[in-house]
Design a protein with these regions (language model features):
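Active-site phosphate/pyrophosphate-handling residues
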Residues: 5, 34, 56
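Short, basic/aromatic recognition patches
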Residues: 2-22
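Small-residue (primarily alanine) positions within well-ordered alpha-helices
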Residues: 10, 14-17, 27, 53, ...
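Short beta-strand scaffold segments in enzyme catalytic cores
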Residues: 25-33
């Protein structure tokens, strides 16, 4: 896996979050060396104090895919 690449993507997402009026946090979900889902902090734009980058990513990914067992995934944030 390319940890540096995935962290750079998370950093880019954190910058995007700040540009969108949120706190600067981003998250990247990876499986088998491939990015499968990304998210940025959306606490302010969604008016939801729980919608941090990581929690929002997990909520959206699991809801969209029906997958709840994430042990084969790596989360970068």
């Amino acid at each position: 896996m390319d940890d540096e690449l995935f962290m750079r993507k998370a950093i880019a997402l954190s910058k995007a979050a700040a540009e969108h009026g949120n706190e600067p946090f981003g998250a990247v979900l990876v499986k088998d060396g491939e990015i499968v889902f990304t998210n940025e902090n959306q606490v302010h734009t969604r008016h939801d104090p729980t919608f941090h980058g990581e929690a929002g990513l997990i909520r959206e990914f699991c809801g969209a895919t029906g997958i709840t067992d994430l042990r084969d995934y790596t989360l970068y944030s």
